[in-house]
From Swiss-Prot:
Involved in the organization of apical junctions; the function is proposed to implicate a NPHP1-4-8 module. Does not seem to be strictly required for ciliogenesis. Required for building functional cilia. Involved in the organization of the subapical actin network in multiciliated epithelial cells. Seems to recruit INT to basal bodies of motile cilia which subsequently interacts with actin-modifying proteins such as DAAM1. It comes from Mus musculus (Mouse). The gene is Nphp4. Expressed in the retina (at protein level). Keywords: Cell junction, Cell projection, Cilium, Cytoplasm, Cytoskeleton, Phosphoprotein, Tight junction. GO terms for cellular component: bicellular tight junction; cell-cell junction; centriole; centrosome; ciliary basal body; ciliary base; ciliary transition zone; cytoplasm. This is Nephrocystin-4.
Length: 1425
């Protein structure tokens, strides 16, 4: 309970003024205030003389100007040092975010910011001084209008302390009061703006509480990334439900005596006379308030229940219940207790040490009218107005323990309680023992249990009405909770996590080959690959990857057959999986016709020119590329301008003709280490005169859309340029960039610009961009845009078909959605070389770092950094000119007697000294008369005295810093600096040659300050790295002595040199920011002002290794500078998953021997597979299997709240020591709101989704990924009112049985932003087939066939029927609906469309009634011969 008490006592709030009535009809407004920096000379010279070690911080308090009342709690920033550089003006930087919310929206409510300095007195005590304050206006002059300015503002500061605001002469507006003295040249830079993302967290933060964004709030998760601001976009911990039963109170010494004394004391307190008859006041009710408290405030309104005496319950219940209560209250020594007859349920508990359950016992008293024999006066006690809290208790449950019984002591008296009200006194404890003190105030006892049905409120905050009733609560394991109470018996104890079933297979050549009936093409011979052995070695793994997910739930045969059909979790797989691109992926083999090529060339696409304004040489994408790294590095054109030109997007012939074609598209990709690119929306303009549909047809060109929505078809295409020149690349990075172009495949995701749904992905190799000495080169590609759809087949009826833990495959359909026409170019540019340090040289690849220990100090100034390293003669300089700290001390000493005003006028010591010298020169020139000579002598005397004082200060300063400076120079003499160029997951191996510089032996302890840098302790691992790098230094067995968690030790003989093997390996990457919305339109003016090729920052890392002998003395220091380099992403996986659940994936690797260029292991054995993940919160592992068995990489990752996107990398190794990754995968997990729908194939199922309006009016439209099976009402554009609630009606008619996943997006059509997104999980069962037919058709027949079938109305009345089919592309009806009288027969006309290939198809015909409910289903088997 310490954590709760600590949070509770540290967050005590002063309430607002009683006259400032809380406006209950208004909502609380959230604010974010960022205090950036202080400008100006705030600290006076007198403070500098009086205090040392000066530091500064800010304090913020809410203040009511009208009632002159401070309220809330004073918030403090972190303490910052005041010793700033000598620049003008002085600045102290804070950059701290402050958050709060309040309902007191009135201009008189302000925030007072106080500047406080703290320092040490001469006796060592801490002294706090106020240096000024400012008045920050939260609300505008108009009431209820919060300030909306988000830009930086300056807050003027005033002399004095905020206590001056309590003076009666300071009236509003206080800024214009004559008593307020403004501080010149002093201000505070800040921003203040409303912060709506804080609104879901109002239940965790009390009103008027000022909190920092860096403060840990109980109930909130830590923020993503390294910003540390948890309130900028709050993320909530998942709540759990706790149940309390058999609750009763025991009061001391007995319930009767306790209540009798309480009534008598209340009567005495109210009447002010002696004890009266207790009949004038009686107990009406005994209430219990129960609520969850997070240390800051109550999470929800308390639940109020009524307690009754134990005997009252026993008289109204059965004998068994009476025995139960009597047994539970044996410890009360026969005393009567207060019992709760109901069950308590607390769904808002969170697994956090500061969360506690608060119990408050309240008594309600009744004063009968005329109890004393007279008429009731207006001042008498009313019948229900007398309520008093008498006891309270706090329980901090351990959420990891199981159900049990708890007994808590009750508390009372003057100590603080969560309700901040007066509590009835406790008995005197002066003569009591510790055991008696625990029970003499009373006890509370109850049974508790943790519910397994999961929370009933949304994890984003358990606010009333926040979650729509259509969604079922999700359990911690991801299994939906039962919809009825009858299911609780089995659903409360799930036997397994209920994993979903999925399988994905991608072809190594073209992903479209999976859906084709033709046999797959044979992979090319690796010996004939034009890429050479170097690229073959990089292509260890490629595109054949399978996804498997095991169903660990126990089958029905093991559970027993239940009486009720239980709800089953819908197995989930993503709708769109990425095309898995590998090193062998090529552009489509289908070529455009010559007529289409002419049409493409004549469309007016801008021509790409080289540096000489000449057309760029075009190469054939099927031509081999011979990569010569030396030729690429010796190119005189050091700049590479990479051009990506998007030309056209054509619809594929294999695409379903009923699917609507998008009107606009946009693309997302990432090139090298530039930021992730999201292009503007592009209009698809249909070309006239295109050929007939075929694999090589060209249908639509891409045209940029203007900001007003118009487009000009005369300037088609989108061109993006990336400039990679020596100014962009780091030293030695040219080699990395050439390798990137040679080995990497660029993945481009194609999105619908209107619905923001993923259409598909395409992959293009960039090896043709290697210029190999040419001035420029370009290549045109026609790329297949592929989408992979998953469908769960009908599950087996019997549980015995698939045993426990078996893997069940699902149907995977790979569909070619279209073809993207793309041109890539690389234009060479001549660049100026760098002034110092040539980037032409590759980074140092030396594996041995030498340090012979013979370095020494060659003399020189200890005050000049790097002085001993200088080898040239320089002019002597004054010490104060090269040491700013010494100059500040000399200036402070000079102005010690001039007062703070003179000290604040000039702070530059060098400038002051120059003015002094000029004054002396002028005095000497004017030295003719006696007065001038006398003045000159006095000045010279003053200068000599000043110089003498300066020499004393310099001598004292030198003595103080001598030891530190000598130690620094000696440390530099034994320090070796080295730079590493590391990539994600790659182990950088090197050896440090450590020499013992002494004539005696030493045991050296090796200390490393970075977890990513380690010593290689295993001799086999050391030998492996030596052989891999070709290093021939000595290798020793058992070189280090290990002492548990302490630093390893090494024994060195006198003057001996030993090679220390070290390895640096990092799995951390910077935060990624993928987007699912198109970018703004980029005009030529914008492109000139802000180039598109600005790179993303890759921070430099540092590590230090200390070599320390037994005495603690350092004999060597190794300082490593690690420059992170971009890594190659071989495959990108994009998954869509329900929010706040676990995604469990098993990605199957292909057989090892089928991969060209794969490493060769032992005969008949596959090399081991190891995996690592960049996110420590993701569970990632690869299990070892037997020879010839498939290998699976298992992933388990928690999805966040919708619409969060989580990105991480998976690194795969094929060696035991994790030296070099053979593949790197990027995984993107999209979290969506989940809607489960159970339906029948061919039958319409209706449901409604609740839409909640934002703060403004928005014109929105609903889009779906399967418009043939899911319809919405309204179908077009409609208005979503602000803060309103509106229903979106959805109609689902699946065509086939099984489980499918449909995306539903609500998009703002004006700004093309995603307002809401759902993942509709369809669980569709097949209706009963009443009749079956079979026909035969000629394959390739262009005419088709007409057939007829009959249907008899089984009802006695006339009925209307509707016809539907699961294959509308193969079967059409003569009439979509018909009417038939009762008992009559109707003939249905069928039109079977031709098929281009031989085979057989089963077509279902659904006959529905007027309400679209299925009446009968026919099956027609069509044989194409």
């Amino acid at each position: 309970m310490g954590d709760w008490h600590r949070a509770f006592t540290q967050n005590t709030l002063v309430p607002p003024h009683p006259q400032r009535a809380r406006q209950l009809g208004k909502e609380s407004t959230a604010f974010q205030c960022i205090l950036k920096w202080l400008d100006g000379p705030l600290i006076k010279q007198g403070i500098l003389d009086m205090l040392s070690e000066l530091e500064c911080h800010l304090r913020v308090t809410l203040f009511d100007v009208t009632y002159k009342h401070f309220f809330g709690r004073t918030w403090k920033t972190t303490v910052k040092p005041t010793n700033q550089p000598s620049k003008q003006p002085p600045r102290i930087t804070f950059n701290e975010p402050l958050y709060f919310h309040t309902t007191l929206s009135h201009p008189s409510i302000v925030a007072v910011v106080e500047v406080v300095t703290e320092g040490r007195k001469r006796d060592g005590t801490l002294q706090l001084l106020s240096c000024g304050f400012g008045i920050l206006r939260i609300f505008g002059n108009k009431p209820e209008s919060p300030t909306s300015a988000a830009q930086d503002k300056r807050l003027r500061l005033y002399h004095g302390t905020p206590r001056a605001l309590l003076h009666p002469l300071l009236q509003d507006p206080i800024e214009q009061n004559k008593f307020m003295r403004l501080m010149e040249n002093c201000s505070l830079q800040y921003t203040l703006k409303p912060h709506p993302p804080l609104e879901p967290a109002f239940h965790l933060l009390p009103e008027n509480l000022l909190v920092s964004g860096f403060q840990q709030i109980p109930g909130l998760l830590p923020p993503h990334g390294d910003t540390g601001d948890a309130l900028r976009k709050p993320r909530f911990q998942k709540p759990t439900t706790w149940h309390l039963d058999d609750l009763f109170f025991t009061l001391y010494p007995s319930l009767e005596k306790f209540e009798e004394e309480l009534v008598q004391l209340l009567i005495s307190d109210r009447e002010g006379v002696g004890l009266l008859d207790s009949g004038t006041l009686e107990v009406l009710e005994r209430r219990l308030h129960v609520c969850v408290h997070n240390g800051l405030g109550f999470v929800q309104r308390p639940q109020v229940v009524v307690l009754v005496p134990e005997m009252d319950v026993a008289l109204t219940r059965s004998a068994s219940f009476s025995r139960k209560i009597s047994a539970s209250s044996k410890n009360s020594s026969g005393n009567q207790a207060l019992v709760l007859r109901s069950h308590l349920r607390l769904p808002e508990m969170v697994s956090h040490p500061a969360f506690a359950i608060v119990f408050q016992l309240e008594y309600v008293f009744n004063s009968p009218s005329g109890a004393d024999g007279g008429a009731s006066s207006p001042t008498s006690i009313s019948s229900v107005a007398c309520m008093h809290m008498v006891r309270w208790a706090v329980w901090n449950p351990d959420l990891e323990v199981g159900p049990g019984k708890v007994t808590l002591p009750l508390q009372g008296g003057v100590q603080q309680n969560p309700s901040r009200c007066l509590v009835y006194k406790v008995p005197s404890a002066s003569m009591s023992s510790e055991e008696v003190k625990q029970v003499e105030s009373g006890t509370i006892q109850f049974q508790f249990s943790l519910s397994s049905d999961g929370p009933t409120e949304h994890a984003n905050g358990p606010r009333v009405g926040r979650r729509s009733s259509r969604k079922m609560p999700a359990s911690p394991s991801g299994t939906p909770a039962p919809a009825a109470r009858d299911l609780a018996a089995t659903q409360d104890s799930p036997v397994g996590p209920g994993l979903s079933l999925s399988q994905l297979t991608a072809s190594p050549l073209s992903p479209a080959l999976q859906s084709s009936s033709k046999p797959p093409l044979q992979p090319p011979d690796s010996s004939q690959s034009p890429e050479g052995p170097q690229l073959q070695a990089e292509s260890v793994l490629e595109s054949r990857v399978s996804h498997l997910e095991a169903d660990l739930s126990q089958p029905a045969s093991l559970q027993g057959t239940p009486a009720v059909e239980h709800l089953q979790e819908l197995p989930f797989t993503p709708l769109h999986a990425p095309i898995v691109v590998g090193a062998q992926t090529r552009s489509s083999r289908s070529q455009l016709s010559r007529a289409a090529m002419v049409l493409l060339q004549s469309s007016g696409f801008p021509e790409i020119l080289d540096a000489s304004q000449q057309p760029v040489e075009a190469v054939n994408p099927i031509d081999p590329v011979r990569f010569n790294p030396q030729k690429e590095e010796s190119d005189c054109l050091r700049g590479n301008e990479i051009v990506l030109q998007f030309l056209a997007f054509s619809r594929a012939a294999q695409d379903c003709p009923g699917t609507p074609w998008p009107q606009t598209v946009y693309f997302t990709f990432q090139f090298y280490r530039f930021p992730p690119e999201t292009t503007p929306r592009l209009q698809l303009v249909k070309l006239d005169g295109t050929g007939k549909s075929g694999s090589g047809s060209l249908s639509h060109i891409l045209v940029p859309i203007n900001k007003d929505g118009s487009f000009d078809a005369g300037s088609p295409g989108l061109q993006l340029r990336y400039m990679v020149d020596p100014g962009f690349l780091k030293p030695g990075e040219q080699r990395w960039f050439a390798h990137y172009l040679a080995a990497q495949t660029l993945q481009v995701d194609v999105w619908d610009g209107d619905s923001l749904l993923l259409i598909g992905s395409a992959g293009v190799q960039m090896k043709h961009l290697l210029r190999q000495g040419r001035p420029a080169v370009q290549v045109s590609h026609e790329l297949e845009v592929v989408a992979t759809e998953y469908e769960q087949e009908m599950m087996a009826v019997s549980g015995d078909v698939a045993g426990f833990g078996s893997v069940k495959p699902i149907g995977v359909h790979t569909v070619v959605k279209g073809r993207l026409h793309l041109t890539l170019a690389n234009v060479g540019h001549a660049c100026e070389p760098r002034a110092r340090g040539s980037n032409l040289l590759p980074p140092s690849r030396s594996r041995v770092i030498s340090n012979d220990g013979a370095s020494f100090f060659s003399g020189g100034s200890l005050l000049i950094p790097g002085g001993p390293k200088r080898k040239r003669v320089v002019q002597a300089q004054r010490l104060a000119d090269v040491d700013s700290e010494l100059a500040a001390m000399l200036l402070t000493h000079t102005r010690a007697g001039q007062g703070p005003q003179a000290a604040g006028q000039e702070a530059d010591a060098v400038h002051k000294r120059k003015l002094e010298r000029m004054r002396l020169v002028r005095l000497q020139e004017a030295g003719g008369d006696s007065d001038s000579r006398r003045i000159s002598l006095l000045a010279q005397h003053s200068v000599r005295a000043q110089h003498s004082r300066d020499l004393q200060v310099i001598d004292a300063y030198r003595e103080r810093t001598k030891a530190e400076s000598i130690a620094g120079v000696l440390s530099q003499a034994i320090t070796t600096h080295h730079t590493l160029y590391a990539t994600l997951g790659t182990a950088e191996f090197f050896e440090f040659a450590l020499k013992n510089p002494h004539n005696t032996q030493h045991t050296v302890a090796i200390e490393i300050d970075s977890p990513e840098l380690s010593i290689i302790l295993d001799s086999q691992e050391w030998r492996y790295f030596k052989e891999a790098t070709g290093l021939h230094t000595p290798l020793e067995e058992d070189m280090f002595h290990l002492r548990g968690s302490l630093a390893p030790q090494l024994y060195l003989r006198p003057r001996e040199t030993a090679h220390i093997p070290l390895k640096f390996q990092s799995f951390s990457v910077g935060p990624l920011a993928p987007t699912q919305a198109p970018a703004e339109v980029i005009t030529e003016k914008d492109a000139e002002s802000g180039p598109l090729w600005k790179c993303s920052a890759m921070p430099t890392k540092h590590a230090k290794v200390l070599f320390r002998v037994e005495t603690g003395q350092l004999i060597a220091v190794l300082c490593l500078t690690v420059e992170p380099q971009p890594h190659v992403v071989d495959q990108v996986f994009r998954f869509y998953h329900p929010e706040l659940t676990f995604l469990k994936k098993a990605i199957r690797l292909p057989p090892w021997h089928t991969l060209p260029g794969a490493p060769v292991g032992m005969p008949g054995e596959d090399p081991p597979v190891h995996v690592r993940c960049s996110d420590p919160n993701v569970i990632c592992e690869a299990q070892n299997v037997g020879p010839g068995e498939p290998r699976d990489v298992f992933l388990k990752v928690a999805s966040g709240p919708s619409p969060e996107i989580k990105d991480f990398f998976v690194v795969i190794y094929a060696d035991r020591w994790l030296a070099v990754p053979v593949q790197t995968w990027q995984v993107c997990l999209h979290s969506l709101q989940r809607v489960d729908v159970s339906c029948v194939a061919g039958q319409l199922t209706r449901l409604s989704l609740v839409l909640r309006g934002t703060q403004t009016v928005r014109k929105v439209r609903a889009f779906t990924s399967h418009p043939q099976e899911l319809k919405t009402d309204p179908a077009g554009v409609f208005v979503l009112p602000p803060h309103g609630v509106q229903d979106l009606h959805v109609g689902v008619r699946p065509r086939r049985a099984g489980s499918r996943f449909v995306h539903l997006n609500l998009v703002d059509i004006d700004y093309h932003q995603l307002v809401a997104s759902w993942l509709v999980c369809l669980s569709c069962r097949q209706p009963l087939i009443s009749k079956a037919f079979e026909i035969t058709m000629a394959a390739g027949d262009e005419k088709g066939t007409n057939k007829r079938i009959t249907y008899t109305n089984p009802y006695p009345s006339r009925r209307t029927y509707r016809l539907h089919s699961d294959r509308p592309e193969l079967l059409r009806f003569k009439e979509d609906s018909f009417q038939v009288a009762g008992g009559e027969t109707y003939t249905i006309g069928l039109r079977f469309l031709p098929s281009g290939s031989a085979g057989q198809e089963e077509i279902l015909i659904y006959i529905n009634d007027h309400e679209d409910k299925n009446e009968e289903t026919f099956c027609v088997k069509v044989l194409y011969q």
